[in-house]
């Protein structure tokens, strides 16, 4: 045990020294360094405990912002970890940063599981976790992320609250129902175990005493009787009234982060006379034959703004498997359709998603995706 502590101490010192490099690191918003955390540890240790919220996507940041609004006066530290960095991520990170006491953006362009990234990043996260003041609650959506376990294992007595990460919380094959973290390579697995001890996905799931869901009336994988389920409406369209739809029709295809969807998306756009594509926040490719909607807003926020400006326009939203279909289906003047390529086999992995759309009253439109 003495040797393990000594090794961890040396590791902490090394990572802390390298943390100085991030003091003026614009890529990480200048707050990935450990200086601010060290100040808290030294001077605010006896203050009010903090709440940690971990986010990996823009949707998760939206949920986190709503959770924070329910606890005015409490201290919140937000940690965003993402392989992506673009206008949308910056916009929503700055939104939540303004409402949190501290916010940290870990931009990991090559992903955490890359060999050269994993060990230094996990060590850095462990050091940062130990520099935090007292932690009261930890909120997270991505139960399968071993990076969060670096914090969970440091504060095993903190309350754990979970929240939705899109349709993954509505499908029984979700990775959130797994038991152990997926870490490739013996060296990385052993290092992860040193950083997180015996923490696991199952331990996180079982420790959660409350789950926030953004989907009303749909069976959630976290709704197993072990915890309180709290509905958290994410997008408020209550003040908008349905118009007579005499102002024309706007058809929008929701993009996908998967590059292999490019060709099939272009065929769908042509088949259904779709004029616009709303790129997925993690999408890096464009589509020909349609106009790209360049906006810092996610599609739900964008559409709500458009409805206010054009209350008599009919909006048709087309998607392959985006969870935004479920969050927008009840917006006034909005009609959502799920696209199903005819070439998909019956046992394709999207089958549960289409079943979910059907259950929610979203029409499934099959089209010929072959020339």
Curated annotation (Swiss-Prot):
Reaction(s) catalysed (UniProt annotation): a beta-D-galactosyl-(1->4)-N-acetyl-beta-D-glucosaminyl derivative + CMP-N-acetyl-beta-neuraminate = an N-acetyl-alpha-neuraminyl-(2->3)-beta-D-galactosyl-(1->4)-N-acetyl-beta-D-glucosaminyl derivative + CMP + H(+)
EC number(s) recorded for this UniProt protein: 2.4.3.6
Identification of the protein by name: N-acetyllactosaminide alpha-2,3-sialyltransferase
GO molecular function, one term: N-acetyllactosaminide alpha-2,3-sialyltransferase activity
Pfam families for the chain: Glyco_transf_52
Subunit (UniProt): Homodimer.
Main localization category: membrane
Localization: Cell outer membrane
InterPro entries: Glyco_transf_52
